[in-house]
A protein has these predicted regions:
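Sec-dependent N-terminal signal peptides of Gram-positive bacterial secreted proteins and lipoproteins
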Residues: 3-28
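Cellulosome-associated attachment modules in secreted, modular CAZymes
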Residues: 21-28, 470-532
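N-terminal carbohydrate-binding accessory modules
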Residues: 25-99, 110-130, 137, 463-471
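Structural recognition of the beta-strand scaffold that forms the well-ordered cores
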Residues: 58-65, 96-102, 106, 160-167, ...
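Aromatic-lined substrate-binding rim segments of carbohydrate-active enzymes
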Residues: 75-172, 200, 237-254, 374-397
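Extracellular glycoside hydrolase catalytic/binding regions
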Residues: 79, 181, 191-208, 213-394
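Surface-exposed intrinsically disordered loops and tails
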Residues: 113-141, 178-185, 225-230, 274-288, ...
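Substrate-binding cleft of secreted/luminal carbohydrate-active enzymes
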Residues: 341-469
Length: 532
């Protein structure tokens, strides 16, 4: 990664009102000199990289911490431990982004200054800072005041925040509802909540992103409750709803990153959204299935269009392992390559390879202990996905910090008091660090925790690297022409040989140099990959 002297180029960057014109729109926040509350907004460049205001690439590597979405009115775990101490631990362990699940219902409660339905689940004896009196055993503050204290602490600790609209209604099983609206909270209510949230924090770049809706899903068994993705304006068309919501958000703050998740199913070739889920007489499947929020097949023909704000779009799939559900791609002997070929590529990885937009894996996680994962298959999947994200700089937020996620566990246990060092050791290589192992913040001023550095520290003191003259180099096996030879080249070549339209470098793909591209090249490439 190139390091650029911020001071040398700051004036030039600020003087320009738009960069990467056209499809990527403006990537510079303002023509005015930004203060420390406005200098950390992030944008997307033409290479589908998330960059800071100076054009420096960044890597969002965070975790999830839930509670606000389930009725606790605060992060879970604050019922026993001190909230500031837990946030400090998250920062010290190097997580530079916190994805916080919330609900439309909660945001509208705060907007209207309505009372908490119940006292927030806060231990007033271990959290005196969160009491009205500021003393041990005092009266617990209003939940929105507690939340704003958390925002302040995150800022000081170098943690950025992404709000996730996890569900319309506040409920422990709210994520089970497939759409962004219910009979109690409409699409218009969702818009209203998003607009209020955006306006309230438009001058605080601690909150850098909004995940518009967690895991839109649903199948054709109940068509009215199925999130779909097409060019219609139907009420359950997630693409249209996401574009409308993003437009409203970006009209208030054009600097927020907009995370758009996928859906669950997409019609197979020759079928459309009117097809039934399955023909049981012939056992014919009419839809491609995926994890909830993990299906972006529709984005190939109908990508999200944010107009002049396209530079704020990030696609955000979720991915889980066999302990959550035994998907077909978790067959015996599965590998990173087999999952890529059978699931990842067509559902979301193609978006990154084609530089349509960056990817942020909004949820990934699971058990790795012998009791829960005796055959190691879940750990194997986690390792495959982690390595994929490291190699391709896929942004991510691990699920989760909480110990009380029933099908995954968390980074802590023992009533939020002890870190799972084995699980953290698996995640740690995928956290953004410099060559000395220092964690890197997304904030230009504040370092991330006690073991990290600020973004300015990381990018300071280096002269800009001038581009060298482009030289086309033949790299045998580099089928996708990304200057590396790895399993993604094997996947691309396999698709090409199978007759699937695939953009490849034919010179590099001719692995055996016989002037033809075929199965023999694929065999030789796979032998090479196995050897090395």
């Amino acid at each position: 990664m190139k390091r650029i002297n911020l001071k040398r180029i700051a004036a030039a960057v600020i003087a320009v009102s738009s960069v990467f014109a056209g499809v990527y729109g403006s990537t510079v926040p303002s023509a005015a000199e930004p203060d420390e509350y406005h200098d950390d907004w992030l944008h997307v460049n033409e290479n589908a990289e998330i960059v800071d205001m100076y054009g420096n690439p960044v890597w969002l590597t965070g975790c999830n911490w839930f509670g606000y979405n389930v009725g606790s009115q605060v992060f879970d775990g604050v019922w026993s431990r001190n909230m500031h101490e837990m946030l400090t631990e998250i920062a010290d362990h190097g997580f530079n982004l916190l994805r916080v699940p919330m609900s439309t219902q909660l945001l509208l409660q705060w907007k209207n200054n309505e009372p908490d339905p119940a006292t927030p689940k806060i231990n007033e004896w271990t959290n005196p800072e969160l009491t009205v009196e500021g003393v041990v055993g005092g009266k617990v503050k209003y939940s929105f005041d507690v939340w704003n204290q958390a925002v302040k602490w995150c800022r000081e600790l170098g943690i950025k925040i992404m709000i996730d609209i996890h569900s319309a209604e506040t409920a422990s099983a709210g994520h089970q509802v497939s759409l962004w609206y219910t009979d109690k909270y409409s699409t218009e209510d969702w818009y209203e909540a998003l607009e209020w949230l955006t306006d309230y924090y438009k001058d605080d770049d601690t909150l850098i992103a909004i995940d518009l809706k967690n895991e839109p899903h649903g199948k054709a068994d109940v068509p009215s409750q199925m999130a779909k993705w097409d060019d219609s304006k139907d009420p359950n068309n997630w693409k249209y709803a996401a574009e409308c919501a993003a437009e409203k958000v970006l009209a208030i703050n054009a600097n927020l990153l907009i995370m758009v998740e996928g859906i669950e199913v997409y019609p197979k070739e020759g079928y459309d959204w009117t097809a039934p889920a399955k023909d049981w007489t012939t056992n014919t499947e009419f839809y491609y299935g995926a994890w909830w929020g993990g299906n972006f097949r529709g984005a190939k023909e109908n990508p999200i269009d944010l107009g002049e704000h396209q530079s704020q779009l990030v696609y955000s799939p979720h991915d889980y392992g066999p302990l959550v559900y035994e998907q077909s791609w978790f067959h015996e002997g599965f590998t990173q390559e087999s999952i890529m070929e059978e699931y990842w590529y067509d559902n979301w990885f193609y978006l990154l390879e084609e530089k349509t937009a960056p990817l942020l894996m909004g949820e990934w996680g699971g058990f790795i202990d012998e009791q829960h994962d005796p055959d190691g298959s879940n750990t194997k999947w986690l390792t495959c996905l982690r390595d994929l994200m490291i190699e391709n700089r896929i942004h991510h937020t691990f699920w989760c910090f909480n110990e009380n996620s029933g099908d995954t566990g968390g980074l802590v246990y023992d009533n939020f008091g002890t870190w799972d060092e084995d699980k953290y050791a698996l995640v740690k290589p995928a956290l953004w660090k410099d060559e000395n192992g220092k964690f890197i913040s997304l904030d230009h001023k504040f370092a991330i925790g006690a073991n990290g550095i600020s973004l300015s520290d990381y990018y300071s003191g280096q002269q800009p690297t001038l581009p060298s003259e482009s030289i086309d180099t033949l790299i045998k096996g580099d089928v996708n022409n990304d200057k590396k030879v790895n399993i993604f080249d094997s996947v691309a070549l396999k698709r090409f040989v199978a007759g699937i339209e695939t953009d490849i470098d034919k010179n590099n793909a001719d692995f055996n140099s016989d002037g033809n591209i075929g199965i023999s090249d694929l065999i030789q490439l796979n032998k090479f990959l196995i050897k090395y």
